[in-house]
Regions:
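Conserved end of the kinase activation segment
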Residues: 89-100
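Terminal C-lobe "cap" of eukaryotic-type protein kinase domains
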Residues: 154-160, 164-179
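Catalytic-loop of the protein kinase fold
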Residues: 42-68
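Activation segment of protein kinase catalytic domains, centered on the conserved DFG
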Residues: 14-37
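Hydrophobic anchor on a C-lobe helix of Hanks-type protein kinase catalytic domains
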Residues: 113-117
Length: 213
C-alpha cells in the first residue's frame, strides 16, 4: 500500500519536485521511463493508499509523480486529487477493477506529459463516452500513442493489465535507449517539433486541436 506524505516530506525526499513541472515537454524516452516506474510501483505496492484510517484508490496524475533522479515514483499527497484523471467508470460511480482504472489514469497522465493538455478537451474522464474518439498523441510516437489509446478505452475489459503495460513499456524503453545510441533517425531540419502546440492536427480529434498562437 502506498503511504501518504506531506508536501514538505515530498520536497525533502524529492527536491526536483513533480512531473507536473515539465508537462508538455516530455520526450518519448522519459514517457516510457515514467510508465515503467509508475506501473512497477503500483504492482509492488498496490493501487491503494491509507488516508485517515480508510483505504482509498491512489490518485495518479503528473502532480502525484515525483522526479527521482533519472526516474520517477508515484506518491500520495493530500489535496492532490484532479478529476481530469478519473476514469469514466469512477466518474459514473460504476463498479470497476481498481487496476484498470489506474491504467486509464496513467494513460491520461502520459497524454498530458507529452501534449501539455488533458484529454477530452481538457475535461478528462467525465467527458468521455462509449462513442468518444480516442486521442492520438504524436505521429512520431506511434507505439506510445497506440498504447495510450488502448489504456484509455472506455470499455474497462478492453484495457491492458498493469503487467501488460509494464512489459510493453520496458521493451520500448530499451528500444528508445538503443536508438539514442545510434543517433537521430531524422535530419534536424525535417524532424517534427516536440512542441504540443505544433503537433500534427490531423492526429487529433477536432475538439482537441491546440490553439495556434
Amino acid at each position: 500500500m502506498i503511504e501518504q506524505m506531506t508536501i514538505e516530506q515530498l520536497l525533502e525526499a524529492y527536491p526536483e519536485g513533480t512531473a507536473e513541472g515539465f508537462a508538455g515537454y516530455c520526450d518519448e524516452l522519459s514517457a516510457w521511463q515514467l510508465i515503467v516506474d509508475v506501473t512497477t510501483k503500483l504492482l509492488d505496492d498496490g493501487c491503494w493508499v491509507m488516508v485517515d484510517g480508510q483505504q482509498k484508490t491512489v490518485d495518479i496524475s503528473p502532480a502525484c509523480i515525483a522526479i527521482n533522479g533519472s526516474g520517477f515514483t508515484l506518491v500520495s499527497l493530500p489535496d492532490c486529487h484532479d478529476d481530469a484523471f478519473d476514469a469514466p467508470e469512477i466518474v459514473n460511480n460504476q463498479q470497476a477493477a481498481p487496476e484498470k482504472s489506474a491504467v486509464w489514469a496513467l494513460a491520461a497522465t502520459v497524454f498530458r506529459m507529452v501534449m501539455g493538455c488533458n484529454i477530452m478537451n481538457g475535461r478528462g474522464g467525465k467527458a468521455q463516452k462509449a462513442t468518444s474518439k480516442l486521442p492520438f498523441m504524436r505521429n512520431e510516437m506511434p507505439v506510445l500513442s497506440r498504447l495510450v489509446q488502448q489504456c484509455l478505452d472506455y470499455d474497462v475489459t478492453k484495457r491492458p493489465s498493469l503487467d501488460e503495460v509494464l512489459a510493453a513499456a520496458k521493451e520500448n524503453l530499451e528500444r528508445c535507449r538503443e536508438e539514442m545510441k545510434d543517433g537521430p533517425r531524422m535530419k534536424p531540419e525535417t524532424a517534427s517539433s516536440t512542441s504540443a502546440t505544433q503537433a500534427d492536427s490531423a492526429a487529433w480529434p477536432e475538439e482537441m486541436i491546440p490553439a495556434q498562437n
